From Swiss-Prot:
Family: In the N-terminal section; belongs to the MGMT family.
Listed cofactors: Mg(2+)
Alphabetic keyword roster: Cytoplasm, DNA damage, DNA repair, Endonuclease, Hydrolase, Magnesium, Metal-binding, Methyltransferase, Multifunctional enzyme, Nuclease, Transferase
Catalytic machinery residues: C66
Record organism: Thermoplasma acidophilum (strain ATCC 25905 / DSM 1728 / JCM 9062 / NBRC 15155 / AMRC-C165)
The name this protein goes by in its record: Bifunctional methyltransferase/endonuclease
Length: 323
C-alpha cells in the first residue's frame, strides 16, 4: 500500500516533461518507437496525445531524438523542423533505418519498446485510488468562507488564482510558475494541485475548476485537493467526462457522482459533501448562471495569462469591477 505522505510529496512537483524526454533519449540509434509505446512507458495509453505535444515542443532535438518517434503503423509522420518530414526521413536513414514512401520497411525489426521505466502514471493511478478511498460524503459544517481556485495557461506558464469570500469581504491572490506536467485526461490533479496548495488559505469550502469524484478513479482535482487539505470541496467543470446520465444526475459505474446543473456546468462533490449537497451549494452561489467566486477566480487567472502576468494585484474594488 502506498503511503499517503510519501506519495503526495513524490508526485506533488513531479516533472513529467523531464521524465518523458529521458525516455526518448533511451531510443537507440538505428531504432524507432511509437507515440503509443512511449505512452505505455509512462504508464497509461491515454497519454499518447500528450506524448505528441511534448515531442512538438522539444527544444533540444539533437540531444532528445524525437525524430525516432513514428506512427503506430511505421508511417514517419510529422516533424517540427523547418524542413518537416523530409528532415525526419533524412535523419532516420542516417541512422540506418530504411524508409520508402514515408514508411519504415520491416517496421517491427526496428521498433524499440524496451524502455527502462517505473511507469509513473500507473503509480499515480494507484495514488488516486488511495485518495478516492479517503473521500467522505459527510462532515462539512457551515460554509462561512469559500475559496475558489482557477488556473489559466500561457504556453508553458501557469497563472493560478484564488478568491476568498467571507461574507461581504473578498480577497484575491494570483501566483505564476512554470508547468512541469502536460494535460493528460484523468491526471489534472498532478498538474494543478501544487498551485492550489501554494495559494491555499484556511477556508470552510474549496470551490475548484475541475471534477471531484466524477473521475475514472473517483479522484479528480477537487477530491485530491479536499482530501489532502482536509477541507470540504466541490468541483465545477464545463465539460462532461465519460459517464452516463439519467435526467440531471451523472453516474459512473452505477454510482451517482455529479449533477449537470446546465449544459456547461457539471458539479461533483470533492470531499466532506455528497452529490445533492454539492449541487445545492453551488446553486446558492449562482450569478449569471455560474458560481460567482469561481467566475471571479477564472477572470483573474485569465487576465493574468492574457497579459503575461503584467497585472500584479487586485484591490477589492477592482475585483468588484471584474464581477
Amino acid at each position: 500500500m502506498l503511503g499517503s505522505i510519501a506519495c503526495s510529496m513524490e508526485f506533488e512537483d513531479f516533472d513529467l516533461y523531464s521524465y518523458f524526454y529521458g525516455l526518448v533519449k533511451q531510443i537507440p540509434e538505428g531504432y524507432v518507437t511509437t507515440y503509443g509505446d512511449l505512452a505505455q512507458a509512462l504508464g497509461d495509453p491515454i497519454a499518447a496525445r500528450a506524448v505528441g505535444y511534448m515531442l512538438s515542443i522539444n527544444e533540444d532535438p539533437d540531444t532528445i531524438p524525437c525524430y525516432r518517434v513514428v506512427l503506430h503503423d511505421g508511417t514517419v509522420g510529422n516533424y517540427t523542423h523547418p524542413l518537416g518530414p523530409m528532415e525526419k526521413v533524412r535523419r532516420l536513414r542516417a541512422d540506418g533505418i530504411p524508409v520508402v514512401d514515408g514508411m519504415i520497411e520491416n517496421f517491427d525489426r526496428y521498433r524499440f519498446r524496451d524502455f527502462k521505466t517505473d511507469q509513473p502514471l500507473r503509480k499515480m493511478q494507484q495514488y488516486q485510488e488511495y485518495i478516492a478511498r479517503k473521500y467522505s460524503e459527510s462532515g462539512a459544517g457551515e460554509f462561512r468562507t469559500v475559496a475558489a481556485f482557477d488556473v489559466s495557461y500561457e504556453e508553458r506558464r501557469a497563472f493560478a488564482s484564488m478568491v476568498i469570500q467571507d461574507g461581504s469581504t473578498i480577497e484575491a491572490y494570483v501566483i505564476s510558475d512554470g508547468i512541469n506536467f502536460p494535460y493528460i485526461p484523468g491526471y489534472l490533479a498532478f498538474r494543478e494541485f501544487r498551485f492550489i496548495k501554494k495559494l491555499y488559505r484556511k477556508a470552510d469550502l474549496l470551490l475548484i475548476d475541475g471534477n471531484g469524484i466524477l473521475h475514472p478513479r473517483f479522484a479528480g482535482l477537487a477530491t485530491h485537493a479536499g482530501v489532502l487539505l482536509d477541507r470540504a470541496s466541490i468541483g465545477v467543470a464545463k465539460h462532461l467526462t465519460r459517464s452516463t446520465r439519467h435526467q440531471d444526475i451523472i453516474y459512473m459505474q452505477d454510482r451517482p457522482v455529479g449533477v449537470m446543473i446546465r449544459k456547461n456546468m457539471i458539479v461533483s462533490p470533492g470531499n466532506f459533501i455528497d452529490v445533492n449537497g454539492s449541487a445545492d451549494t453551488v446553486r446558492k452561489m449562482w450569478n449569471d448562471r455560474y458560481p460567482w467566486p469561481l467566475k471571479l477566480a477564472h477572470q483573474l487567472s485569465t487576465r493574468h495569462a492574457e497579459t503575461g502576468g503584467r497585472v500584479s494585484e487586485y484591490s477589492i474594488e477592482s475585483a468588484h469591477e471584474l464581477h
